[in-house]
Amino acid sequence: MNRPTRLVIIVRADPVICGHSVEARNLAETALERGFTDVRIVTWPVERLETAGLPLKPLDRVLPYSPGITVERPEPVGDYKVPDGRYLAGIVGRLVELFTDGVPTVCLSLYLSPHTVAVADALRVAWSTGLPVNVTTIAEAVGSDVTNVVRQAVAEGRFGAAAHVLSSYLAQDHCVAVSQYTRELIVESAAEVDALHGTSFAAQCRARVGISYPAIDSTPYLDLDEAEVDRVLAARGLARGSYVLFLSRLARAKGVDDLIRGFERSGARAGHRLVIVGRGPEEAELRAQAAESDAASLIDFLDDVGDAEKPYLMAGCAAFVLPSKPRPEFVETFGIAIAEQMLAGGGPVITCDTGGIGEAAGGHASMIPVDDPDAIARAIDEAVAMPADEVRALAERARAHALQFDRAAVFDRMFARVLPEPAVVGG
């Protein structure tokens, strides 16, 4: 194909609280810097996201996109007689329109189900029209699309559902996964399908799926103004080094229940608070647990933190704790928040070596067992007692590791196989 001028990204975009909605933003912004003239994020109407029960940021805290990035939220097609396909039909229809105008286009889908499935359907329709189609596709598997769809389909003996996702994935020009762990998970799940039905998905996945780590915009985390850090923290009633931080979705797999128990057992509570930042399906349950804790007066929940404030909270914490644990519905396939914390250069990271977290942490975090509040307590106490020079040295090593996930580096590696010539850096 000719050098692409348009990038279309299909994703659950802002205001969804998800590292991959942020990744989509970062790749879109980098595409502008690399010479793409038309960058579009095709996503779901906000009311549909609300109805789905996804954790959402406050709309007034969502940062604007740069000029040149268009966010499209296609309206549903059909009426009440189409019970569960109206919104997907709107997205597929819009993709068909973008794929048939002859503009050289790269289409990147994040989440195989339903986004890569939608791209595969739209391409089939686009080719059938006889109109000019000049599209290269990339599908990025984030992990939960395997654990939440393919594995469930295999467990329930639903071959068709698993085959639908895997075949749509392999129909794309380029297949990537967000970590080595995720790649192995895909191959393993495909092998289960093959063993039951005599298919050959695993061999194809093993041969074709590469790794593309999530793209993070490192700029907001680097060289933070010290006075501004203090000002942002003071506005929340906090001071540098006075709190232990959790920042992610409030879901069972994130281990916040263990963190609350661990904090109340720690000696660090004598001089620190626990700040829990995020929204999610377990929020009410976790607030109730915290209220019943004997450390209740030291635990704060913040549900209105936007992307602009996040780096300052990370930079000022005494320790950052993400005690994720594997669940049937979710496994941490990378750990974007861990990489962001390392870029911010705050206190030590405490986490669990589950899923792809080890790839994000790169040996620069304190690894503890899952489901172990006592281990969390010990790790917090060790972190807050660490001498300042050791904290600084650890932060410098961690940041050097995390810089490989900067959006420009990730974009260039991903698109090196796609673009027919080296990317042009915008002035």
Regions found by a protein language model. Name each.
Residues A315-F330, G347:
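Acidic donor-binding loop of glycosyltransferase active sites
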Residues L123-E140, S144-S168, A191-H197:
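Nucleotide-sugar donor phosphate/pyrophosphate-binding loop at the beta->alpha transition
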Residues T136-A139, A162-R231, D300:
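Donor nucleotide-sugar binding/catalytic pocket of nucleotide-sugar-dependent glycosyltransferases
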Residues K254, D371, A388-P420:
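A charged, aromatic-enriched C-terminal amphipathic alpha-helix characteristic of glycosyltransferases
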Residues T351, G363-D374, E382-A388:
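Conserved acidic donor-binding segment of nucleotide-sugar-dependent glycosyltransferases
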Residues I338, L343-T351:
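Short hydrophobic beta-strand element within catalytic cores of glycosyltransferases
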Residues V176, I216-S218, L233, G237-K254, ...:
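Conserved donor-binding/catalytic core segment of Leloir-type glycosyltransferases
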Residues L123, A284-E309:
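Nucleotide-activated donor-binding/catalytic signature segment of Leloir-type glycosyltransferases, i.e.
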